[in-house]
């Protein structure tokens, strides 16, 4: 099931589920369809769906079957015209760093021996503030003092139930679904910060976290390692990889960061594959983002996250 969070013309948050009608994809507005059908209660928001567990999912699937059979324009919204929101309300995101093997290797300038020595026992990363997250089709301003403006397509895991290091819970079962994340980065600031062993400002300028548009529920992904992610700038392919190149897998990241105590709606991002501008040869400046660029970040089976640089 593919889930969307968007808002109506009046500004109200809507929960939408993707369905096909007349050869096109539409969003079933869950609240509107439920109001017409009546009967069993269905979640009114993305967070209610996530927190409601299996019962909420079953009720939503039942409503989707009912609505899809009728295809009434009253509850069908066009994804090309809605105003998107981030897939979950404002949440900070735990971001893994150097977690794809080939990206880790390119970051060490091809030195496999040095690359193998980097944090091989557990995932490391940083926190991206919730206020940086922006939805599908957002315009993101390149900061005035940033020229080395980079992209990083990633998969963000959406946590579906509370989990911490004290609970005997299968980490994979805590994953509600997957969405697309673009970890925009100011490399000048990031590299200066990394000289002091930290990353903060270089990852946390306003708008540096495009995310969405959909959450694909975990039950629709039988083999997460087969997920393919890619990124294009102005139609040019820059990044492409499947998740078999991950160093720490989805469940391993959830298990490790559950030490924080994860709750429904929390986000964990995988890190990015090779192909970032920072390591482009011969000159990274040829690939850094600039005003006027259109960035498409995609995950096969989930969709495309579009961002415009201004």
Where on the chain are the PLM-derived regions?
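A generic local secondary-structure boundary/capping motif
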Residues: 4-5, 83-85, 113-116, 140-149, ...
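Residue "hotspots" at secondary-structure boundaries inside conserved domains
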Residues: 86, 92, 147-149, 260, ...
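Catalytic-pocket segment enriched in acidic/His residues
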Residues: 12-13, 57-61, 77, 83, ...
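N-terminal non-catalytic cap/leader segment that marks the start of a structured domain
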Residues: 1-119, 294
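A gly/proline- and charged-residue-enriched helix-loop-helix capping module
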Residues: 116-137
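A short secondary-structure junction signal
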Residues: 105-108, 136-139, 144, 166-171, ...
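Short, structured patches in soluble enzyme cores that scaffold and shape functional sites
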Residues: 7, 128-130, 137, 144, ...
């Amino acid at each position: 099931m593919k889930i969307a969070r968007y808002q109506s013309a009046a500004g109200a948050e809507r929960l939408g589920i993707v369905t096909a009608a007349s050869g096109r994809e539409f969003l079933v507005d869950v609240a509107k369809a439920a109001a017409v059908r009546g009967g069993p209660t269905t979640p009114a928001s993305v967070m209610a769906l996530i927190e409601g567990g299996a019962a909420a999912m079953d009720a939503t699937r039942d409503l989707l079957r009912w609505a899809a059979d009728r295809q009434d324009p009253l509850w069908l919204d066009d994804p090309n015209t809605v105003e998107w929101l981030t897939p979950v309300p404002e949440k900070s995101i735990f971001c893994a760093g150097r977690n794809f093997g080939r990206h880790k290797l390119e970051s060490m300038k091809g030195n496999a021996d040095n690359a193998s020595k980097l944090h091989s026992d557990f995932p490391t990363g940083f926190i991206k503030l919730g206020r940086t997250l922006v939805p599908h089709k957002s315009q993101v301003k390149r900061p005035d003092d940033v020229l080395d403006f980079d992209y990083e397509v990633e998969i963000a895991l959406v946590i579906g139930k509370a989990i911490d290091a004290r609970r005997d819970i299968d980490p994979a079962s805590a994953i509600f679904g997957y969405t697309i994340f673009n970890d925009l980065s100011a490399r000048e600031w990031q590299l200066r910060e990394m000289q002091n062993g930290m990353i903060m400002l270089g990852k946390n300028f306003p708008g540096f976290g495009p995310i969405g548009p959909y959450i694909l529920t975990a039950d629709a992904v039988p083999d997460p390692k087969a997920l393919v992610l890619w990124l294009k700038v102005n139609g040019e392919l820059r990044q492409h990889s499947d998740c078999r190149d991950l160093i720490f897998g989805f469940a391993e990241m959830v298990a490790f960061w559950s030490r924080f105590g994860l709750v429904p709606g929390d986000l964990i991002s995988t890190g990015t594959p090779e192909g970032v501008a920072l390591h482009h040869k011969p000159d990274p400046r040829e690939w850094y983002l600039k005003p006027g660029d259109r960035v498409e970040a995609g995950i096969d089976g989930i969709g495309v996250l579009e961002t415009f640089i201004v």
